[in-house]
Amino acid sequence: QRRCAADYAERLLTRRDVWSLMLRITPINLDEANAFVEQHHRHHKRVPGAKFCVAVSQGDKVHGVAIIGRPVSRIVDDGWTLEVNRCCTDGTRNACSMLYSAAWRAAKAMGYTSLITYTLESEGGASLRGAGWHCVGKTKTAGRGWNTPSRPRVDTHPLQQKIKWEAV
């Protein structure tokens, strides 16, 4: 019995490979993306606004979202730069890398020349490296928060030094 090359190649694919092949980038609106972030993100909540959002899906199930908007730092906000404000997945393999890559392709298509994001020092950045991004340094200081003696506040986000990444 002869087997064709397609049958042989099909057997070489692992279940993980097949799963990744079925994932695709889809559009998503900000409300749906924020709902996903509130349910799955480890240390941040929803964002108030965005330029655009993308999702990685398999069929009708969303496995991750990226929310892209103006840079939080006004020093970086030159009109040609966007920031991935949130990237959040349910742990699906390769989903983060797919989202970062799709965000950069969309930003370039819209005429932006730079796309940045920040990770905590405790996060490895493998998804960013896998998507072709480069580490461009660390923030000068850890976040200060908004708590003052005259106006006490409770900080709900991590106040540690962050690593800055840029898409290339």
Q: Regions from the language model: what does each represent?
A:
Residues Q1-L21:
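Short, Lys/Arg-enriched N-terminal segments with co-localized hydrophobic residues
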Residues R15-P48:
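Short amphipathic alpha-helix that is part of the acyltransferase structural core
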Residues M22, T81, K162:
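A residue-level signal for beta-strand positions that form part of recognition/binding surfaces
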Residues I25, L30, P158-V168:
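Contiguous surface segments at macromolecular interaction interfaces
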Residues P27, P48-K51, Q58, G69-L159:
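Acyl-donor binding region in acyl/amide transferases
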Residues V56-G59, A167-V168:
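Active-site beta-strand termini and strand-to-loop segments that position acidic
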Residues G64-V65:
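Short glycine-/small-residue motifs
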